[in-house]
């Protein structure tokens, strides 16, 4: 099962490919503000991690690390922007598994993982299975039973083709032997809105994105994909606990 999304925020840059030890030895880095591109909409897990990292880096390095969102096409628009950027260390990508690796494979993006140089991993993010709050199934087991009984009836949302939420849902439905229809969005905010309204049946999203909606009773969270429970949603069981 795809359990987590790895985030290399403020961390991966085409810029770093040509920014070797010689250049670093000749000048202090950073000598000016650094642009950090997040290839997703504001409020998602990658965005939150990137902003936290940018704040820490700004304080530690004496220059501003400025986060800018360039969302769309499963994260490949922002990643393409960084891949084309000048290789001087001042344009970084708050990358994730979806934007760096699966995006080029599924979306035909004009770059590959080899076009980026990893600097550090800053977070791993589990995904939570959610539906609208009044969906009839009261537990993960009941949800599975409902989906299996009507294998062609339901839909699932994601933040874009090739995103980890998309791939997690595909694996989930594949293992259940059902053919739920994928509805991709430009970011998870609109996707989650349509899940809450019942226009789309379910989705896998990060705890950061859904926590306030779970707590306010707008969505029902069934299970988290990680080995251990999420600190953000400690009352939501793991998938292993529900099977």
Describe the residue ranges of each PLM region.
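Extracytoplasmic "Venus flytrap"
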Residues: 36-51, 72-73, 157-164
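Beta->alpha turn/N-cap motifs
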Residues: 94-99, 103-104, 188, 205-210, ...
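C-terminal lobe and pocket-closing loops
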Residues: 124, 210-243
């Amino acid at each position: 099962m795809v359990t987590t999304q790895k985030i290399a925020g403020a961390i991966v840059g085409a810029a770093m490919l040509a920014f070797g030890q010689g250049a670093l030895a000749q000048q202090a880095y950073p000598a000016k503000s650094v642009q950090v591109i997040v290839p997703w909409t504001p409020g998602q897990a990658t965005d939150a991690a990137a902003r936290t990292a940018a704040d820490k880096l700004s304080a530690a390095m004496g220059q501003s690390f400025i986060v800018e969102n360039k969302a769309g096409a499963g994260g490949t628009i922002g990643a393409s922007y960084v891949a084309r950027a000048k290789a001087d260390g001042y344009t970084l990508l708050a990358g994730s598994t979806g934007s760096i690796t699966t995006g080029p494979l599924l979306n035909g993006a004009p770059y590959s993982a080899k076009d980026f140089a990893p600097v550090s991993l800053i977070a791993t993010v589990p995904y939570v299975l959610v539906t609208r709050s009044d969906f009839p199934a009261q537990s993960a087991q009941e949800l599975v039973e409902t989906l299996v009984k009507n294998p062609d009836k339901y839909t699932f949302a994601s933040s874009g083709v090739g995103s980890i939420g998309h791939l997690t849902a595909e694996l989930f439905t594949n293992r259940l032997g059902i053919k739920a229809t994928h509805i991709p969005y430009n970011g998870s905010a609109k996707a989650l809105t349509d899940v809450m309204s019942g226009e789309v049946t379910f989705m896998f999203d990060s705890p950061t994105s859904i926590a306030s909606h779970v707590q306010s009773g707008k969505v029902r969270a069934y299970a988290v994909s990680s080995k251990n429970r999420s600190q953000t949603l400690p009352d939501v069981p793991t998938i292993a606990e529900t099977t």
